[in-house]
């Protein structure tokens, strides 16, 4: 597939330590869209230098709001596949090709599955999700979607679903979902969920 038909959406808030290398590592696979969620550091400058399209939020809209802006831009560019990718260095960029292959072979949504979780709340969320929807790791930030899923189901909700909503709605709507094991690296920077206590609260609230 023409790489201009693939968008890699990277939400970013104060990710100057990692964003340049993250963009560099994925841009061979498609158009890279960095959503700069009101960062106060040099995230925008470093993302642009690395070759990304940058969308700037004047006010922080959170992870779901950043995904909304990235998906809207990808759709505007005519991209047929949208891959979400975290900015903290955890995800293996070499796996993007596997996500694209699964979608080209008929899957509508591809969800990465981590081998272990750092928080009790993640275990609880995963257990509930697996029981209700058959999705092992809805909190994983590396997912792939066809543009058709986005066009039919619309944007992420205004409440903080931490990027889980579109995958779950896809299951409820009968879209074909594939899951793929991920190799996860240690975080280079802070977690997108925040500190330990706030992260657990945020994750459980999303249920």
What residue spans do the PLM features occupy?
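Short, well-ordered alpha-helical segments in soluble proteins
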Residues: 100-103, 128, 132
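Catalytic core of nucleotide-sugar-dependent glycosyltransferases
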Residues: 123-131, 197-207
């Amino acid at each position: 597939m023409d790489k201009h038909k693939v968008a890699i959406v990277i939400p970013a808030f104060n990710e100057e330590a990692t964003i340049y290398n993250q963009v560099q590592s994925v841009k061979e696979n498609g158009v890279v869209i960095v959503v700069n969620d009101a960062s106060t550091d040099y995230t925008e400058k470093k993302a642009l230098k690395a070759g990304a399209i940058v969308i700037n939020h004047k006010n922080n809209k959170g992870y779901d709001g950043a995904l909304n802006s990235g998906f809207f831009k990808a759709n505007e560019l005519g991209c047929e596949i949208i891959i979400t990718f975290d900015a903290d260095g955890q995800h293996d960029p070499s796996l993007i090709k596997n996500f694209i292959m699964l979608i080209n072979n008929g899957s509508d949504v591809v969800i990465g599955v981590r081998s272990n979780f750092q928080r009790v709340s993640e275990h609880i969320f995963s257990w509930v999700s697996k029981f209700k929807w058959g999705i092992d790791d809805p909190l994983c930030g590396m997912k792939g979607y066809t543009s058709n899923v986005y066009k039919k189901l619309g944007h992420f909700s205004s409440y903080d679903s931490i990027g889980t909503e579109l995958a779950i709605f896809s299951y409820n709507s009968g879209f074909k979902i594939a899951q793929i094991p991920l190799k996860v690296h240690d975080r280079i920077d802070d977690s997108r969920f925040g500190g330990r206590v706030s992260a657990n609260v945020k994750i459980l609230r999303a249920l």
